[in-house]
Amino acid sequence: MSWTYKQHEIGDITQFPENTFGFVYMTTHKPTGKSYIGKKVLFHNQKKKLGKKELAALTGVVGRRPSYKLVVKESDWMTYYGSQTDIKKLLVEGKKDEFERTILKCVETKKQLTYFEIKYQMLYQVLEKPDEFFNDNILGKFFTKDLADIVFEDLVVERK
């Protein structure tokens, strides 16, 4: 199953807008209607230990020789559904067909990625609606259980 972005299927990394660092997504479990909002990066920097030949090629280099190199590697974005434990359990049971994956926003930096993840989680009120969302925390700082006793009402802010 591929991702959907602006009503188009995305099945390859070349189909993303140019300079995309990552994206904010919504995974929806169709039978229950529950969703999960999260973020995913497209590339990872991975430390790879230098082999004997690569180390030998560095002889004569002044100063400390590097013992590793950074390798840019594509992430598992194509097969990713979310990090939430309930979603993982459903996937282990072989229920991938029951999920719909939608990209909400593509971004160019790590900071924007975190900002828009939080923005969408707040806009959709993921912590206030535990019957509609799998999300049980935002940033590992705000938790559903901490808001259990609070009655949420629609706030109307009047502007002058």
Regions flagged by a language model, labelled:
Residues K40-K110:
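Conserved short loop/helix modules at catalytic or binding sites
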Residues G140-E153:
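IQ-motif-like calmodulin-binding regions
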